Amino acid sequence: MKSKKENIAEYILYLWQLEDYLRAFPEKAAESQELMDLLMMMHEEGIAEEGHLDLAKIALSEMEDLHEELLETEAPYKAAIIHIEPQLNILKSKTDCPTMSDIEACLTLLYQTMMLRLQQIEISEETNIVIHDATQLLRFLSKTYYDRNIEE
């Protein structure tokens, strides 16, 4: 499994992908102990049909906490958020959870982009710019998270 410490954003996206995979193909869980364990967790947590594992929610919460801290201490980071925020607000307004955090919106954007690319659906240049900005933001957050947790 992807390591949360290595790249927390990729870890969350990986968990989301596994959740969708196991919902679509629950019989595939028998192929590995990792998948079997995740499917069992999904059932125990009541998210067999929709929702996210506590593992993903905790990691997202950790990213959001770091995000809030960096908004207070890193002027370039705050400027990057201010730059992307209008596009994130548009994205949020088109979801069933318009009150999601900016970090969850960035992750959702990247996850949805991955799904569109798998379906070979073209993505507009305007959207690609937002994807790039969200990726840079998550990359910075993940690197900061990694740097702070490397000693553990």
Language-model-derived ranges and their functions:
Residues 1-50:
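N-terminal interaction modules that seed assembly of large macromolecular complexes
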Residues 4-7, 31, 52, 73, ...:
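Residue-level recognition of alpha-helical structural elements
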Residues 13-20, 37-44, 65, 86, ...:
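Short, hydrophobic/amphipathic alpha-helical patches that form generic packing surfaces
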Residues 34-72:
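Long, charge-patterned amphipathic interaction tracts in eukaryotic proteins
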Residues 47-50, 68-71, 75, 96, ...:
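Residue-level signal for secondary-structure boundary elements
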Residues 56-107:
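A charged, amphipathic interaction segment
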Residues 89-152:
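Glycine-rich, aromatic-bearing surface loops/beta-hairpins
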